[in-house]
Amino acid sequence: MDVSSDKYEKIVDLAARRGFFWPSYEIYGGLAGFYDLGPLGSLLKENIRKLWLDYFVFRHQDMVVLIETPVIAPEIVFKASGHVESFTDPIVTCSKCGKIYRADHLLEDILGIKVEGLRPEELTSIIREKGVKCPSCGGELEDVRTFNLLFQTNVGPYKHDVAYLRPEAAQGMFTSFKRVFNAMRYSLPLGIAQVGRVARNEISPRQGMVRLREFTIMEVEFFFDPEDTEEPDFSRFPEKLRILTADARSKGLDEVVVVRPEEAVAEGIVLNKWLAYWMSVAQAFAKELGLREDEILFEEKLPEERAHYSKQTFDQLVSISRWGWVEISGHAYRTDYDLSRHMQFSGEDMTVYRELKKPKEVTKKSVVIDQELLKEYFGSDTPRVLQALRRLSVEEVEKILSEGEVIVDGFKVPARVFRIEEVKEVVRGRRFIPHVVEPSFGAERLLLVVLDKAYYEEGGRVVLKLPPKLAPYKLAVFPLIPKEESLRTLARRIYHDAVKAGLTVIYDEDGSIGRRYARVDEIGVPFAVTVDYQSLEDNTVTVRFRDSREQIRIKSDEVIKWVLNNL
């Protein structure tokens, strides 16, 4: 077992033993892709959520709001979004034992080649050419086919009321866009954020907490005018990004570009300024989770790897034990895909109107229909034909003029009934469908990353060097001699004051002081206060720092203020 695998096993053992996480339904043998969060894991995840909200919502209150939408949505929502058709992975079945594998992962594991994004027939060809067999029994593999990852259910007792568990929070934000836009006084840019549960029926979830069938997603759908020239305030998060471009990847190169976000836009590396901006926010957020800059990389997805809705996607990768580089967030430029599709499927207007700073005169093409000539051709059918013709666009009429005629509702209409005129008009505003960029994070995966970066072994003891903001418990309070009632009384008073102040705090009087320090070091408590005999003389207590083990003395009535100032 290599060092990184050994570290990972130790983290998993610690997580189960001390109450961070463990496989769900263990007493029945577990269920792949599902994990429970214990008392410490729940607190750690909540602190990650709060930090994410701070970066992506509360620091952007002038343009980002928080909403909540259901986990279940009717089938039409996911038909419109493209998930019913496109949210699939390739699978292959053994013709002998019947075992099913995710085809691209199988080939990557056996052949060591990257095949993500290849079509089923291309994967089948590789299986045949390389003679890949079933790893379990050696049997022949069938042709590769697609498997939809949506969890299907029914709403109420009727089987025809098909619905799905959402695989992303995004669609609830898209379908609610006009409501939120109106509530926020028709302002763009507008970010709609959501934190909630999602489900993906993964074929063969692996890598523990890295790939789950149910997890908490944290997303922003950021709506903006694609013609708006106003720049994001890049100075708020000015650090450089490490980017591996799709161009480099397509050439088999691993040369990383280090560039400021605004420079990445200017040089055409990132297609949209808001995409670059939210990538810079994501980098700052990741560093506060305990990651170094050299451990963070934005990898641009190749065209065949991108989701059906994306014009450009970057995965934010971080390096962790055993699994190497793993994705902690995805950053997609979804353009107007989602709003356009929901507009098409629902019939609701998803456009917005913006007044121009200065009205301008424009020349537009307009279709004119010669109604008198139309009557000569169609007589009493003229109203019906006219109604159909009025639905034609300028582009469609231009095509008719070049072809000579068109058949509409069964009537052959000659081109001579049309003409196109240019008219001048004063435009005071424009109507358009907003574009969207999306930063999206998985909370449980972040939890694993945070534990991986915080885990240290020092002098035979385990220390979780969690950032104090993220630590499940901020403070531990110990009476040095538990049997001494006066020490216990002061320690309990400090404990209760800490609870009243909103701190998560542990009170422990079991065992030696060394054992108590070791127990709280192992779960990442950053500060420990010990009440000793000197405390009774001068009203001071010892504060011990988890990472350095250094100790200082402060007044007992200043403990709460001191802890709050050092988080």
Residue spans of the language-model regions?
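NTP/phosphate- and nucleic-acid-binding module
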Residues: 1-567
